């Protein structure tokens, strides 16, 4: 039916799931039905579509401190939602957990959580991924000895102008700002290279306000959200930080998305 939509669900195969699940949502009733499963990929914990919705890209969240993970490319059958694997490329670091496709459909930018690094992979005309054109290693730590003993790049977001990439590093309590060089597949430190979060907050995810003038950073360890002004040159100025838990909360908690 014309009102039917497809949803793609990434999973951890090490926890018993089998890969990337395609669900069909009935546009009239909202009911979900599993229609296919793409196997042969390990821990596709995060997935993203290209601007045309013709290809899907997934992280392969594998690799210990000495190994490296990968990103995988799939083509999408527009009629059935089936995923056909195209190829995989290494991200150069362990534990890739997040990725984004840029607005020109030319680059995938991925973050390696365990490795504390950022990788850029070019997208070829057929949707396949090329070898890395950029690898940036973050160096640093913060005050939580269990979770912030080193850099942990947790997510990447790209602004509407397709010129800046923002990387939340949970381990360093920083949001890094990069200018995107689309022609060469590079990331260059922006005019404001980074912004510091309050020590121990652990920035995890990042989202833009529809106005394009504000952004919000979700802090996993502090269970807070920090609001920033977004300037025309891509810089960030803090406004306020608010909690996500009741004032009298005394238990352990972390925020996710």
Can you say where each PLM-predicted feature lies in the sequence?
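Blade-loop segments of beta-propeller domains
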Residues: 34-105
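Short loop/turn segments immediately following beta-strands, especially the blade-tip
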Residues: 23-30, 74-82, 120-130, 178-187, ...
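Asp-box/WD-like beta-propeller blade repeats and closely related beta-sheet repeat scaffolds
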Residues: 81-155
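Loop-centered beta-sheet repeat module
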Residues: 162-223
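Beta-propeller fold detector
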Residues: 32-39, 83-90, 130-140, 187-195, ...
